[in-house]
Amino acid sequence: MANTKKTTLDITGMTCAACSNRIEKKLNKLDDVNAQVNLTTEKATVEYNPDQHDVQEFINTIQHLGYGVTVETVELDITGMTCAACSSRIEKVLNKMNGVQNATVNLTTEQAKVDYYPEETDADKLVTRIQKLGYDASIKDNNKDQTSRKAEALQHKLIKLIISAVLSLPLLMLMFVHLFNMHIPALFTNPWFQFILATPVQFIIGWQFYVGAYKNLRNGGANMDVLVAVGTSAAYFYSIYEMVRWLNGSTTQPHLYFETSAVLLTLILFGKYLEARAKSQTTNALGELLSLQAKEARILKDGNEVMIPLNEVHVGDTLIVKPGEKIPVDGKIIKGMTAIDESMLTGESIPVEKNVDDTVIGSTMNKNGTITMTATKVGGDTALANIIKVVEEAQSSKAPIQRLADIISGYFVPIVVGIALLIFIVWITLVTPGTFEPALVASISVLVIACPCALGLATPTSIMVGTGRAAENGILFKGGEFVERTHQIDTIVLDKTGTITNGRPVVTDYHGDNQTLQLLATAEKDSEHPLAEAIVNYAKEKQLTLTETTTFKAVPGHGIEATIDHHHILVGNRKLMADNDISLPKHISDDLTHYERDGKTAMLIAVNYSLTGIIAVADTVKDHAKDAIKQLHDMGIEVAMLTGDNKNTAQAIAKQVGIDTVIADILPEEKAAQIAKLQQQGKKVAMVGDGVNDAPALVKADIGIAIGTGTEVAIEAADITILGGDLMLIPKAIYASKATIRNIRQNLFWAFGYNIAGIPIAALGLLAPWVAGAAMALSSVSVVTNALRLKKMRLEPRRKDA
């Protein structure tokens, strides 16, 4: 190969030599390609002719075989975007770059998230490409205070607005003269005076629009800057023409439009300032989450307590936390006991009792006891850091509903410029033949009333505020796509253990005296069985002292037999009692049947071959589970329960909480198949679970919802995470989705409707340019303001909420 290039790809998913050989063989089948795949290093080295192939082709080939290619992600801060046409153009250019898998640009956050193949491109190339388009870009610095940066930018906008307003105010008075036939000083009507006021507004304050327009046009694009620059320049330079004609001795009074250009720019700056101010409020939820983080920690070093910055804490460090202090990082208690306020995570205001070996979460509040803890997760690995990451990703993601707006934004400005030119021609040739001014005014009005900004802000602002509000309530959406899909859910499938129930057995019923309970708990105390643990905990709550077992024997399938302090103990089922000639009174037999019918595990207790008690143990239903399921039913959502338990136990739990559909006796690997069956019936299914065996079903469902008290595997597989395990958050999550999508539709209706109605009205000459400019400025503000209403959203579902 005369002209060759070489690239190296990191491959994931190879398990043996057959994998590497298969990939190598497939790549080498391509013309002018020489590939070597190394299983040990998990890399493919490819020599190729760049005139025939590119790296993306090799990546697609590898992925088509079922393997992955390592992708890196970078977040970029972008400044200089003024409307949806800007963000749409940057996104389109980035996605066309070699090595970029996917790029999304968010106008509201002024950030881009780019997934790329490091062998083909890098973050610096991405930044350079954006800068060539005329925007400022930099790699996001997570240590930099984004809030203060935005506050400075907002202050700069305000200063420019004030200067522009001061210069434009006298010119604005001229408009009122025309409208209300008012008398003003002659100075105000002097062309030189108007020129002196309008020029700095046009070319100093408004220079940003010229720069933006030039950079966009140079790169073959067009945005709002083009509309503003063309519209205001037309008014300004026509006024210059009239002024020169007047200076050359024209006898007719000059028709000046300096006030139009200056006031237009001022109103647009005013709208941009209000928009930026409103947009800054959309990230308040994230700011509040960040403010929850502890700032320092008390570490135990050589027996001394030392305060250190939080970022200096390492895994394994021993920390002291006193009452009233925040838990600095995630960890485990090794000494002491306390109550911890975990409301920032769960929304539950009642403090949770914590003892030795219990886990504690960073940034929760220690209420009433000094504890010593070992740090287990620090920095970006803590629970709060992961929550913040999920919220950030959700707020910067795009919902599918935004696609139409993005497509339109890409063509919007050129179409509007074309319409304005057409309107000018129609007016000067047909409406007012030979008269220049009405044609100019109508075309300027068309240019300045058109607003691609509102289209670009309609979806991301609602997603940002909606996901932020949900996060404040313990509901974490992993992206805008999942916000949109959730509102379509009509069926929810709940795993039983750990989701509907608490996931740990407790004693629900006991009939017998304290001596029997003491002997029973002593017999069970050395067992690791969950039922035994429940009995021992119950005895401890009764403050009974447990002794030692002399002999112990398990009777498989029936129970246990033990000797304690010369007492012979039998604990088990009917068969165990019958085998030992112990008869059951009718009321005990009836109680046993009743407990079993309710899905409880009931055990008979005999001391010295005499029946002395009966105890029932069950995994209890979570608080509010019944209320949550009722709310889902009220919303018109079908609820089903999926469990590996037997049908009797499952039916008993379902009856308690009001679930009609029960799918029982299901093996873990069959859960995903059950979800698929429901989907084949045309249902939109959400699966709610907390365990490792729920992960395949969570992935298969249209929406996977993980309970935050569950395993990391389940949470990773889910689209929504419910913090703390409160089932009431499930209907709230669905309502948050519905409210957010409803808000997006309102915004899109306004954004489309405004342009569809505004442009024809302006074309008919019914709007003065300054009125059109004010309408354009306020259209974006109205969209952002409507989105901000979600901040006050009460997550209380309505009956059959649409």
UniProtKB/Swiss-Prot annotation:
- What is one term from the GO cellular component aspect held by the record? plasma membrane
Subcellular localization, as worded in the UniProt entry: Cell membrane
Tell me which Pfam families the record gives: E1-E2_ATPase (PF00122), HMA (PF00403), Hydrolase (PF00702)
Query: In its UniProt entry, what is this protein called?
Result: Copper-exporting P-type ATPase
Location, primary (coarse class): membrane
Q: What class of enzyme is it?
A: translocase
Q: Which residues form the active site?
A: D495 (4-aspartylphosphate intermediate)
From what organism does this protein derive?
Staphylococcus aureus (strain N315)
Q: Where does Mg(2+) bind?
A: D690, D694
Query: What range(s) does the HMA domain occupy?
Result: 5-70, 72-138
